[in-house]
């Protein structure tokens, strides 16, 4: 008997403790966590710096709403924007909220409504974000979606050129479609998007909810492409396990959201900001990012060496890796769990690997050994 809704296919594992990449269940069994709470636990479980930040802030101030000035929000906003061409941040609580804000900002700023998204994308489960998501299974059963969203084939330059015109407010995409199968934007497609934006005055919204904050080895995944965003949405890894989202946007948007035009009660509360600042200070350190890049390259190399290429394809970037299988991967994930490795799917045929950014080579070796045993 349960008092919870049945909207999650929960696994029969009760996790009670975590430290770094290791989590422990109520029976004392340890697992390598290569889910990171779905790309959330950037610095691993119970990172000392995050624990300290949360403890110290919890003894000062928990919540005041956004009716009052916040130097802490100002500092975090500067940390997130200073390495970009963007100027301002707005804080919320989740990726879906950040994407809702991005949609509202683009429509209000341009006075246009049409937003082009892509098939197999995932932008959230609130109604605007769900309408932007290019997956029928996410939208099924909820009636008509919001108007003025069109999902195009991903990486299809011809389809993009046919769809763009002066009525388009924005193009919205993920650099890597994580939920949709770990599909990366191709260089030619990125160039075509930028050309379309320049030619038609279209805004570019990049959803970095899963790829941002060091997940791909750079601060933001778009940095490794030709894409130049006008708007970025963030969440997941930004809080290292504490709920926080953010919208970043350029100088020209400052007056678009005037007082009362958009808001959130909890967004940017002192607890969330203190944790996020700690995460950003760690992850945006060049030495930390270099370490992520090195460990990501090692993980990919080991997977390609140990898994038969005819049966599996390894794709993705940084520590967001997908293993594509010709067979459905549900049984593989279940068997890996039995052997002490937690994984998450990306659709029915892709295993997604999302270890903490602090994962060690020894932990990578252990995970690859389990995967080899399960998949071969």
Positions of PLM-derived features:
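Conserved N-terminal phosphate-binding loop of PLP-dependent enzymes in the Aspartate aminotransferase
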Residues: 1-376
């Amino acid at each position: 008997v349960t008092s919870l809704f049945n909207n999650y296919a929960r696994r029969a594992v009760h996790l009670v403790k975590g430290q770094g990449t290791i989590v422990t269940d109520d029976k004392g069994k340890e697992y390598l966590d290569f889910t990171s709470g779905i790309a959330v636990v950037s610095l691993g479980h119970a990172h000392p710096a995050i624990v300290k930040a949360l403890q110290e802030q919890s003894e000062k101030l928990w919540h005041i709403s956004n009716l009052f000035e916040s130097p802490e929000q100002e500092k975090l906003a500067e940390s997130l924007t200073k390495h970009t061409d963007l100027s301002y941040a707005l804080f919320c609580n989740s990726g879906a909220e950040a994407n809702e804000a991005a949609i509202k900002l683009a429509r209000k700023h341009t006075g246009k409504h049409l937003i082009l998204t892509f098939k197999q994308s995932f932008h959230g489960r609130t109604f605007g974000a769900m309408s932007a998501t290019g997956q029928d299974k996410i939208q099924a059963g909820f009636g008509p979606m919001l108007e003025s969203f069109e999902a195009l084939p991903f990486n299809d330059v011809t389809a993009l050129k046919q769809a763009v015109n002066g009525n388009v407010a924005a193009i919205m995409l993920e650099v890597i479609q994580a939920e949709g199968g770990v599909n990366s934007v191709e260089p030619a497609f990125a160039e075509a998007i930028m050309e379309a934006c320049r030619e038609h005055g279209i805004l570019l919204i990049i959803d970095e909810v899963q790829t941002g904050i060091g997940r791909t080895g750079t601060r933001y995944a778009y940095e490794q492409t030709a894409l130049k965003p006008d708007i970025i949405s963030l969440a997941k890894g930004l809080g290292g396990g504490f709920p926080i989202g953010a919208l970043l946007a350029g100088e020209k948007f400052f007056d678009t959201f005037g007082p009362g035009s958009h808001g959130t009660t909890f967004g940017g509360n002192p607890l969330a900001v203190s944790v996020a600042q700690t995460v950003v200070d760690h992850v945006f350190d060049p030495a930390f990012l270099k370490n992520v890049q090195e460990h990501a390259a090692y993980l990919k190399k080991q997977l390609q060496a140990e898994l038969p290429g005819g049966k599996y394809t390894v794709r993705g970037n940084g520590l967001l890796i997908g293993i594509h299988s010709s067979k459905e991967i549900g049984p593989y994930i279940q068997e890996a769990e039995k052997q002490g490795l937690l994984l998450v799917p990306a659709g029915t045929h892709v295993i997604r690997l999302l270890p903490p950014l602090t994962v060690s080579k020894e932990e990578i070796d252990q995970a690859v050994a389990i995967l080899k045993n399960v998949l071969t």
